[in-house]
Amino acid sequence: MERTLENLDHGWWIVSHEQKLWLPKAELPYGRAADFGLTGEKALQIGLWEDAPVWLVLQKREKDMASVRQLIDQDAGLFQLAGRGVQLAEFYRSHKYCGYCGHEMHPSKTEWAMLCGHCRERYYPQIAPCIIVAIRRDDKILLAQHTRHRNGVYTVLAGFVEVGETLEQAVAREVMEESNIRIKNLRYVTSQPWPFPQSLMTAFTADYDSGEIQIDTKELIDAGWYRYDQLPLLPAPGTVARRLIEDTVARCRADDE
């Protein structure tokens, strides 16, 4: 899967180091390897975008290294490929040596994995499953400001799935821990790879069942029920959180007409 780049190799270039990628002109570079000084570098093709290959190069550039968040408002498919590249780059960087025997490892030629030639151990990229849920109560939606969101954004509740827990159990637990609310009528909506750092967001909607809001101050700054036409500052378009909010708001509005 890995190859040495030649002058005329072309496509989209994910040049990544330590969970950042190279974004000259604030966008993912497209063109020939020679155009970006990549001739002779090792690269992996990790997908196709608009019929052109997407290449991953493990390299740090002196400037224009930025978070993949800068691509979040672009096409979802391109953002997903960029996220894959950043996650794979970090996986290869952090798995140079075997955790069991300490010997140097090498990439598999057939799958996204690192192999130890000494003890034959095989490592795969770690993915952290998360849940995210929009909760409706009549014509209102539960929105919260998280401690990590200091910009005033309100969003839906989310959290990591714990060991030995189903997705449904994780939703109920996270909602209760963060807001003291019980839910019912849980429904799966969609999923979204989320490279911050290596998550897979699993999105649900649910209805309010019982309880009064009591926030976990370690996780939330504020939370409340917001009528569909009186919403606070929301997450950016392109995020699964924004989709959940918009879907819930649309149902509230339709039922109110």
Curated annotation (Swiss-Prot):
Zn(2+) binds at C98, C101, C116, C119. Divalent metal cations. Mg(2+) or Mn(2+). Binds 1 zinc ion per subunit. It catalyses: a 5'-end NAD(+)-phospho-ribonucleoside in mRNA + H2O = a 5'-end phospho-adenosine-phospho-ribonucleoside in mRNA + beta-nicotinamide D-ribonucleotide + 2 H(+); NAD(+) + H2O = beta-nicotinamide D-ribonucleotide + AMP + 2 H(+); NADH + H2O = reduced beta-nicotinamide D-ribonucleotide + AMP + 2 H(+). GO terms for molecular function: magnesium ion binding; manganese ion binding; NAD+ diphosphatase activity; NADH pyrophosphatase activity; RNA NAD-cap (NMN-forming) hydrolase activity; zinc ion binding. Pfam families: NUDIX, Zn_ribbon_NUD. A divalent metal cation 1 binds at A158, E178, E219. Residues 125-248 form the Nudix hydrolase domain. Its cofactor is Mg(2+); Mn(2+); Zn(2+). A motif (Nudix box) lies at residues 159-180. A divalent metal cation 2 binds at E174. GO terms for cellular component: cytosol. Its EC number is 3.6.1.-, 3.6.1.22. A divalent metal cation 3 binds at E174, E178, E219. Keywords: Hydrolase, Magnesium, Manganese, Metal-binding, NAD, Zinc. It is an enzyme of class 3 (hydrolase). Substrate binds at K25, R69, E111, Y124, Q192, P193, W194, P195, F196, P197, Q198, S199, A241. GO terms for biological process: NAD catabolic process; NADH metabolic process; NADP catabolic process. Belongs to the Nudix hydrolase family. NudC subfamily. mRNA decapping enzyme that specifically removes the nicotinamide adenine dinucleotide (NAD) cap from a subset of mRNAs by hydrolyzing the diphosphate linkage to produce nicotinamide mononucleotide (NMN) and 5' monophosphate mRNA. The NAD-cap is present at the 5'-end of some mRNAs and stabilizes RNA against 5'-processing. Has preference for mRNAs with a 5'-end purine. Catalyzes the hydrolysis of a broad range of dinucleotide pyrophosphates. Homodimer. This is NAD-capped RNA hydrolase NudC. It comes from Cronobacter sakazakii (strain ATCC BAA-894) (Enterobacter sakazakii). The lineage of its organism: Bacteria, Pseudomonadati, Pseudomonadota, Gammaproteobacteria, Enterobacterales.
